[in-house]
Amino acid sequence: MKIKELKKAAVNFGTPLYVYDLSIIESQYRKLQNAFKNLDNYKIHFAAKSLSNISVLKFIKNLEIGLDAVSIEEVKIGIKCGFKKHEILFTPNGVNFSEIKEAKSLGVKINLDSLESIKDFSENYPNDPISIRINPGIYAGGNEKISVGHSNSKFGIPEEFINDLIKMDEDNRINVTGLHIHTGSDITKNNEFEKGIKKIFSIATKFKNIESIDLGGGIKIPYFSGDTETNLNDYAKAVEEEHNKFKNNTGKKLKIIFEPGKFLVSDSGYFITSVNYIKKSQNNNFIQVNSGFNHFLRPTLYNSYHEVINLSNPNDQKEECTIVGYICEKDTLAEKRMISKISKGDLLCFKNAGAYGYNMSSNYNSRLRPAELCIHDNSIKKIREKENLEDLLKNQIDIF
């Protein structure tokens, strides 16, 4: 997106502000289609937890993408947005069984990741189809906070319990039709993907009614020029090879599901702030902006890198600075970066803000959440209003 368009959006709608370029989402989807074109039968499901604005979800749905939901609320939002129920996969973690029952009543597919929840499911829905999330015992991903497939992770059925599942399936106490794996996010080493792919296809041979394998997400995008990324063609080739082996060994053809979140929407998003003050100290040049981790949590939570552009002065000499928020915490958004000279009132844009940006925002310090805009068909459209004080108070009950 051009700097001129982003600056115009900030001037017209105020800051802080999230802006999404929907054409980039479609472009990312086309990359996946091209990479997976040799797979016999596959489906892309979007991870709703990364960005759940209904306008964005409807745009994604119109691309004929399915939905990965991790809460009953995401399931309901998906249905409201028009996703077909059989193309919504509900993958909860540690939820009360009442939530699973509600999802079942709504007609979506269920993917469970604990023996206890699977036993409850089999008692309530004998021999109904179910998908199961496996923990492959693989450490993969950009850092420990986004690595979720290792042996100490809370996610998935550990390998030592796989035989219990196979026995339950053989005894017709459960009807396993799908297997799911997700090892982590920002995976660049294809051998880490390959380990999980080989393992899940091997396990799949043990289940008599298996129909699908869900390989989760984890595809890494570059966050700055020269940054590493997942080699999509190598990844697709590894999937094809294991699927072909499976077909040759079993005579069955499986549906392969992928669940990208960040890959589809991260690059489409821009988070724009305004500079309140510049505060110099002995060792730092602090740029204080009108936002913080209440709006943009990833840099603080994950130490994630987001390139910053000075929209007001993009081509001046670069100076080292640290961008901090207005929250009464240590909310550093970018540390010791070289950015075009910044002045009070300048507009700063954080790139790759489409995933886990607004969705992880909060009202901490009683701050209002920002508006969301999208760029579609060469026009800027508001897709969420900025909150007001009434929004903060509307669910509170004054007892005095």
Report residues per predicted region.
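A charged N-terminal "starter" segment
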Residues: 1-109, 115-128, 167, 171-175, ...
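Charged (often Lys/Glu-rich) extended helix/loop segments that serve as interaction or gating elements
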Residues: 3, 253-400
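General structural feature for long, well-ordered alpha-helical segments within catalytic domains
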Residues: 5, 21-24, 28, 32, ...
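Active-site-proximal loop/turn and secondary-structure-junction residues that shape catalytic pockets
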Residues: 24, 48-52, 73-74, 94-96, ...
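Conserved, mostly hydrophobic/aromatic
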Residues: 25, 49, 71, 103, ...
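Structured core elements
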Residues: 66, 89, 111, 131-133, ...
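Glycine-rich, aromatic-flanked loop segments that form ligand/cofactor-binding clefts
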Residues: 127-139
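Active-site loop/helix belt of alpha/beta enzymes
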Residues: 136-277, 339
